[in-house]
Curated annotation (Swiss-Prot):
It is a multi-pass membrane protein. It is found in: Endoplasmic reticulum membrane. Residues 15-26 have a biased composition (Acidic residues). Residues 1-26, 775-810 are annotated as: Disordered. Disruption phenotype: Knocktout mice breed and grow normally. No major defect in T cell subset numbers or function. Decrease in CIB1 protein level in thymocytes and lymph node cells. In knocktout mice, heat and mechanical hyperalgesia in chronic pain are alleviated. In knocktout mice, DRG neurons exhibit a hyperpolarized resting membrane potential compared with WT neurons. Small to medium DRG neurons show reduced excitability compared with WT neurons. Residues 1-205, 275-338, 451-468, 526-552, 625-649, 743-810 are lumenal. This is Transmembrane channel-like protein 6. The modification Phosphothreonine is found at residues 88, 104. Glycans are attached at residues 102, 311. The modification Phosphoserine is found at residue 136. Interacts with TMC8. Interacts and forms a complex with TMC8 and CIB1; the interaction stabilizes each component of the complex. Interacts and forms a complex with TMC8 and SLC30A1/ZNT1; the interaction regulates zinc transport into the ER.
């Protein structure tokens, strides 16, 4: 066997570039000496290149089509490829220790302390900073370790810990290096810690710290376990796919929105009014249980509704009310003004909700519309999706189902692109879609006219104050029409036979959205345009709040009935009578629109019932568990799986623009234009609710208190329309800049992918050149006769074409 030789590169190091990595120009001498290195490497044992040799095929194996055109590389080329840095990373601890020894030398040579972020945890040996050893017997590993330990002892504690932490070694090696590099003082401190030589105060301090840390971990684990979606979301995503999972994720988002809305209402309105309850105007009715359906009765005399809140300042002692029903402020103090608190709390709550909603929508847009290459995505899903930290059998089963469902969705999407529809089929599809839309719009118009007619009939009847069962008539009619129209739309979608299940869901969402928004528009006109005029001398705000409460309760009951009869009964009929193994599918469009409809009712009624977000939270929690149980027991996974990559963005967009924007317009009209009731509520003595802020500013100007800047702030920020336009422009600018940032990130991703592709082509070119050089040397050697045939080129798989990277395509 030939003796292994060592090549020492004598490249002088100047003082000007100490601590810096060599540039490509400075390493030209190193690259020029590669020819000598290749000649010496050719003398090594041939077994080092065995790992790149193709394995022999077994008896029953078949030749893969991709291996027929594989290049026949020589043994020398295989040995060179086997010694490449990318194939030797992590093999030689001596090389790693030698590399970090040179790094510590550079750290000590620097005049100033370096930035820790500049240290790259690479395992490739440097060709410039130490001798290139090809034989491990030249420098022993122990000698390298001792040199590294000496250099580590000369570093500061922070630099030493950071250097050892980033070494690509095992934990035992790192622990050994850290212990050997300790100073004598550090060793004594470590021995004292292990022997327990601590004072009583130190022991008490450490015990308290450990107890607090354990308590915090226990509280966090308890909060994590108390979440209803802790395990259910993974189970749903694994069994039913991302399309059904998007519904439950949207429900979780609505829970967060209502919780954020409820907190300021409880802190500044409900809690304060409950601490200072007003005197009852008459006898308070007893609780009968019917209030849970109608929202009237005993609930009318609680903090549930607008009429219970007082129109005076809340304090333990208050002077007689002056003009506008307000108490005069005492010297040097500003009492709690309930009308002002009611108005500003509602405004701040809606403004905060708007900001969070717009941010969530933009963030979801950036997450879902990122650049994703479909080339090799199936292989990545198969080989790179498993989480090896999962050890429990139940969790591993869920992860297995999730990967299987994800593969089905990817294959279904790929198969859909490979099967375009013919021209005749497209014309037929357009005609069927046109007829379907005409029927949907006609049914929507019919439902709207029916709701308007029935609401006029209800106006002609005497108002019952929301205490009888007859008050549930209008919510029942609206819920029946919504449910019947949704089933009609679903039947039309079945007849239309869409090629894409995503398009089918989007069509159903648009049709249900048009229906529900039209019905809600008629109801808003009924409440503010008709009911206010007929309820003169009564508290119309309480009536509107009770109506919205009844709509939420009846809608919740119909959702339960739909889960019971629409899913459970249909499953029993399909399995018992029809003898089919198929179960009904989960209707994503109708269930999502039910959530948006319920959230719109909450936003419409929060001004007249401050505790309506709490009712919505309870409603969503019940819906989560009921829908999950019904889904697991009565539904099956979609027969045509599809990847819901943009569904969260679509849901948040629909929640923002038609739902939240419409509710904001409704409430702004109620605050600025409609006269409040003169018998109840915090604005009973005012012409509009907005005048509460004007009256408060006027009182501050007359009082001449130290808060004289508040009237100026109210004038320029509230009454001046320029600030409103400026805030709207800033919000639109933030949305625009966020969209541009997302587009820029997608373009950068495209450029990086193109750069990676070019680097791969460069490496293929160099390998081909290296193979050609060895073939020429083999032919030129004496004593060998070989046909002068050109070696085959190392190439990529010819079946895959370069996929164009288009950053504008979602």
């Amino acid at each position: 066997m030939a003796q292994s030789l060592a090549l020492a590169l004598d490249v002088p190091e100047t003082t000007g570039d100490e601590g810096l990595e060599p540039s490509p120009y400075e390493e030209s001498e190193v690259h020029d000496s590669f020819h000598q290195l290749i000649q010496e490497q050719s003398l090594r044992v041939a077994e080092e290149g065995l790992e790149l040799l193709p394995l022999g095929l077994g008896r029953g194996d078949q030749t893969l089509p991709g291996l027929e055109g594989a290049p026949a590389l020589s043994s020398a080329t295989l040995r060179i490829l086997a010694s490449m840095p990318s194939r030797t990373i992590g093999r030689s601890r001596g090389a790693i220790i030698s590399q970090y020894y040179n790094r510590t030398v550079r750290l000590r040579r620097r005049s100033s302390r370096p930035l820790l972020g500049n240290v790259v945890p690479s395992a490739r040996p440097s060709l410039r900073l130490y001798d290139l050893e090809l034989d491990s017997t030249i420098l022993e590993e122990d000698e390298k370790r001792s040199l590294l330990v000496k250099e580590l002892q000369g570093l500061s504690a922070a630099q030493r810990d950071h250097m050892v932490r980033n070494m690509p070694l095992s934990l035992g090696e790192k622990r050994c290096l850290r212990e050997k590099s300790w100073s004598p003082k550090g060793k004594r401190r470590h021995l004292q810690g292990r022997s327990g030589a601590f004072s009583c105060c130190s022991r008490l301090r450490y015990t308290c710290m450990l107890a607090l840390h354990s308590l915090g971990l226990a509280l966090l684990s308890g909060l994590y376990a108390a979440r209803p979606w802790r395990y259910a979301l993974k189970q749903i995503g694994g069994q039913f796919g991302s399309s059904v999972l998007s519904y439950f994720l949207f429900l979780k988002t609505l829970l967060a929105f209502n919780a954020l809305m409820l907190l300021p209402l409880l802190a500044f309105l409900v809690g304060v009014q409950a601490a200072f309850p007003p005197d009852p105007a008459g006898p308070v009715p007893t609780f009968s249980g019917l209030e849970l359906l109608t929202g009237g009765g005993r609930f009318t005399h609680t903090v549930m509704y607008y009429g219970y809140y007082s129109n005076s300042t809340l304090s333990p002692s208050c002077d007689a009310p002056r003009e506008g029903g307000q108490c005069s402020p005492r010297l040097g103090s500003l009492p709690y003004n309930m009308p002002l608190a009611y108005l500003f709390t509602m405004g701040a709550t809606f403004f905060l909700t708007c900001i969070i909603l717009v941010y969530s929508m933009s963030h979801s847009f950036g997450e879902s519309y990122r650049v994703g290459s479909t080339k090799g995505i199936h292989a990545l899903t198969v080989f790179c999706s498993w989480d090896y930290k999962v050890t429990q059998k139940r969790a591993s089963r869920v992860q297995q189902d999730s990967i299987c469902t994800q593969l089905k969705e990817l294959l279904a999407e790929w198969h859909l692109r490979k099967r375009p529809r013919s021209v005749c089929g497209q014309l037929r599809q357009v005609v069927v879609l046109g007829l379907g839309w005409l029927l949907c719009l006609g049914s929507t118009m019919g439902c709207t006219v029916a709701v308007l007619t029935f609401s006029e009939v209800m106006i002609q009847r005497p108002a019952s104050g929301g205490q009888g069962v007859e008050a549930l008539a209008l919510p029942l009619v609206v819920s029946v029409l919504n449910l019947g129209a949704s089933y009609l739309f679903r039947g039309l979608a079945t007849l239309e036979r869409h090629d894409s299940p995503v398009l089918e869901v989007y069509m159903a969402i648009c049709r249900n959205l048009i229906l529900k928004m039209a019905v809600l528009g008629v109801l808003c006109y009924h409440w503010l345009g008709r009911r206010v005029a007929t309820l003169q001398g009564q508290c119309w705000e309480d009536f509107v709040g009770q109506e919205l409460y009844r709509f939420m309760v009846v809608d919740f009951i119909f959702m339960l009935l739909d889960s019971l009869f629409g899913e459970l009964v249909w499953r029993l009929i399909s399995e018992k009578k029809l003898k089919r193994g198929q179960k009904p599918e989960f209707d994503i469009a109708r269930n999502v629109l039910d959530l948006i409809y319920g959230q719109t009712l909450t936003w419409l009624g929060v001004l007249f019932s401050p505790l309506l977000p709490a009712v919505q939270i309870l409603r969503l929690l019940f819906l989560f568990h009921i829908k999950k149980a019904s889904l697991m027991a009565n539904c099956q996974a979609p027969r045509r799986p599809w990847l819901a990559s943009h569904m969260s963005t679509v849901f948040l967009t629909l929640l923002c623009f038609p739902s939240f924007l419409g509710a904001a317009v409704f409430l702004c009209y109620a605050v600025w234009q409609v006269r409040p009731s003169s018998t109840c509520g915090p604005f009973r003595t005012l012409n509009t609710m907005y005048e509460a802020g004007t009256v408060w500013v006027r009182r501050l100007e007359h009082a001449g208190s130290g808060a004289s800047w508040l009237p100026w702030l109210h004038h320029f920020l509230v009454e001046n329309t320029f600030f409103l336009f400026l805030a709207s422009a800033l919000l639109l600018a933030v949305i625009y800049f966020n969209i541009q940032v997302v587009k820029g990130q997608r373009k950068v991703i495209c450029l990086l992918k193109e750069q990676i592709r070019n680097e791969g082509e460069d490496k293929i070119f160099l390998i081909n050149k290296l193979h050609s050089v060895y073939e020429e040397e083999g032919r030129s050697r004496p004593g060998r006769t070989q046909d002068a045939t050109e070696p085959p080129a190392w190439h990529e798989d010819g079946g895959d074409q370069k996929e164009p990277c288009n950053p504008r395509s979602p």
